[in-house]
Amino acid sequence: MPGIVGFGVASKLAKENFHGNVSKLMTLKKRLYQGIVSEIKDVHLNGPNVEEGAPHILNISFAGVRGEVLLHALEEKGIYVSTGSACSSKKKGQSHVLKAIGLKEDLIESAIRFSIGIFNTEEEIDYTISVLKEKVNFLRKYKRR
């Protein structure tokens, strides 16, 4: 019985805070996107305009950098991201979703998915941008030809 009551309270709070949470997520997502495109060259937004997609997910390809390699470089700095699309996160191989939206193979292989939560902060977003700039520039020096 306590679990049901707790779920009811959690549901009520989620409903009451829904619009505020969506607004916060969208603000953080825009900050992340704007920071990435202003600090790093040759990036590609995978999906709709940043304001039209889900407020908590940003999928970007970094030309000349394999997504899996960048994922591990970011992990070393305490930043956890995913490769591919949210719809294919448990499947091996290239994302069928990124293929379906018409991305070329090189963009699919360089895709990183950022998932933002309501407890993330602007400082964490800024840290992520700073680390991304450092790691992407470093990895591009060693890209396969």
Predicted region positions:
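Pyridoxal 5′-phosphate
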Residues: M1-R145
